[in-house]
C-alpha cells in the first residue's frame, strides 16, 4: 500500500486559555487523491485539525507530515505551498478589485512569472466555471460564485491538498451544490487530496472516508455507508444523519422493506422498485 500523503500521528493540541485538549492523541492519514471528511459538533476538534494541517497552529506533541515534509517552523512555507485552504466566509479571502486579480494574488506572493500567472488564473477560473466573471467585482457575486472564486485562488497555486473548513456552511442549497460539484470534478481531474471539515452530513456523502470527532478524539471512522449505518451512535454524540438515511428509517418504521443502506435517492428508488417488483 502506498505511503499516506497526509499523516497525523498521535497529535495533541490545547489552546493557551484552557486546560482541556482541543485535539487529543489523534492519528489520521489520507492517500493522494483521497477525499476524507471530518465531522463533529462544535468543539469536537475538527477545525483545530484543519489549522494544524496548514501550519496555522503547531502541535504540542505528535507528528504532522504532508508529502515529504514534517511540519516545523523550518519548513512551514513548504507545507503551505502544498496545502490550500478554503474558509467558511469567502469575503474574508478576497483582496483583489476583480475576480482575476483576486485569483492572481497568491501567485504574485509566490513570485510566479507573469506569463505563467496569466495561464494559471485562466485555467483555474475555467475549472470552476467562472472565466466569464474574470473582470467582475467579487463583492457582486452570489455566495456560491464567491466560494468558487476562492477555490480558484487555491487551485491556481496547484496544491496537493485542499482543506475545506466549513466551506459551504454559509451557502444556500444551490450554492452548496455548486461548490461540492466543483470540488468533485477538481479532485477527479487533478488527483488532489481533499480534507473537508463540516457539520453538513449530506456533504459527507461525497467523501471516500469519514472520521467522526468527539471531544477532541476520534470517535469512529469508516466509509459514509459504514458511518451512517450507525445512526444511533451518531445521534448519541449530538450528530444527525443525512436526509436519505432518515428517509430509509421512516420507510422501515412504516413497514416498508428497503433493503441495504443506500446513499442516494436514485439508488433508494431503484432498490424499492426491485423489491416491489419481486412481491
UniProtKB/Swiss-Prot annotation:
Keywords: ATP-binding, Cell membrane, Membrane, Nucleotide-binding, Translocase, Transport. ATP binds at residues 40-47. It is a peripheral membrane protein. It is an enzyme of class 7 (translocase). GO terms for cellular component: ATP-binding cassette (ABC) transporter complex. It is found in: Cell membrane. PROSITE patterns: ABC_TRANSPORTER_1, ABC_TRANSPORTER_2, CBIO. GO terms for molecular function: ATP binding; ATP hydrolysis activity; ATPase-coupled transmembrane transporter activity. Its EC number is 7.-.-.-. Residues 6-240 form the ABC transporter domain. It comes from the Bacteria. Its main location: membrane. The keyword S-adenosyl-L-methionine does not apply. Pfam families: ABC_tran (PF00005). ATP-binding (A) component of a common energy-coupling factor (ECF) ABC-transporter complex. Unlike classic ABC transporters this ECF transporter provides the energy necessary to transport a number of different substrates. Belongs to the ABC transporter superfamily. Energy-coupling factor EcfA family. NCBIfam families: ECF_ATPase_1, PRK13635.1, PRK13648.1. Forms a stable energy-coupling factor (ECF) transporter complex composed of 2 membrane-embedded substrate-binding proteins (S component), 2 ATP-binding proteins (A component) and 2 transmembrane proteins (T component). This is Energy-coupling factor transporter ATP-binding protein EcfA1. It comes from Listeria innocua serovar 6a (strain ATCC BAA-680 / CLIP 11262).
Amino acid at each position: 500500500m502506498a505511503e499516506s500523503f497526509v499523516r497525523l500521528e498521535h497529535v495533541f493540541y490545547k489552546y493557551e486559555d484552557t486546560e482541556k485538549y482541543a485535539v487529543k492523541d489523534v492519528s489520521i492519514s489520507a492517500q493522494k487523491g483521497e477525499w476524507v471528511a471530518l465531522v463533529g459538533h462544535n468543539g469536537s476538534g475538527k477545525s483545530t485539525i484543519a489549522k494544524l494541517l496548514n501550519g496555522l497552529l503547531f502541535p504540542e506533541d505528535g507528528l504532522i507530515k504532508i508529502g515529504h515534509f514534517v511540519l516545523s517552523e523550518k519548513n512551514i512555507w513548504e507545507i503551505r505551498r502544498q496545502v490550500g485552504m478554503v474558509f467558511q466566509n469567502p469575503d474574508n479571502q478576497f483582496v483583489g478589485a476583480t475576480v482575476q486579480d483576486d485569483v492572481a494574488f497568491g501567485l504574485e506572493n509566490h513570485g510566479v512569472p507573469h506569463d505563467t500567472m496569466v495561464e494559471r488564473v485562466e485555467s483555474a477560473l475555467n475549472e470552476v466555471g467562472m472565466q466569464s466573471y474574470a473582470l467582475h467585482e467579487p463583492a457582486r457575486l452570489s455566495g456560491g460564485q464567491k466560494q468558487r472564486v476562492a477555490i480558484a485562488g487555491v487551485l491556481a497555486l496547484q496544491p496537493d491538498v485542499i482543506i475545506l473548513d466549513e466551506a459551504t456552511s454559509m451557502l444556500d442549497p444551490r450554492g452548496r451544490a455548486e461548490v461540492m460539484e466543483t470540488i468533485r470534478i477538481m479532485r477527479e481531474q487533478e488527483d488532489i487530496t481533499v480534507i473537508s471539515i463540516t457539520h453538513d452530513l449530506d456533504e459527507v456523502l461525497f467523501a471516500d472516508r469519514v472520521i467522526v470527532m468527539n471531544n477532541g478524539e476520534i470517535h469512529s471512522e469508516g466509509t459514509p455507508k459504514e458511518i451512517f449505518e450507525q445512526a444511533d451512535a451518531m445521534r448519541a454524540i449530538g450528530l444527525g444523519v443525512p436526509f436519505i438515511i432518515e428517509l430509509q428509517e421512516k420507510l422501515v418504521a412504516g413497514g416498508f422493506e428497503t433493503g441495504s443502506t443506500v446513499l442516494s435517492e436514485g439508488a433508494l428508488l431503484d432498490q424499492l422498485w426491485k423489491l416491489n417488483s419481486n412481491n
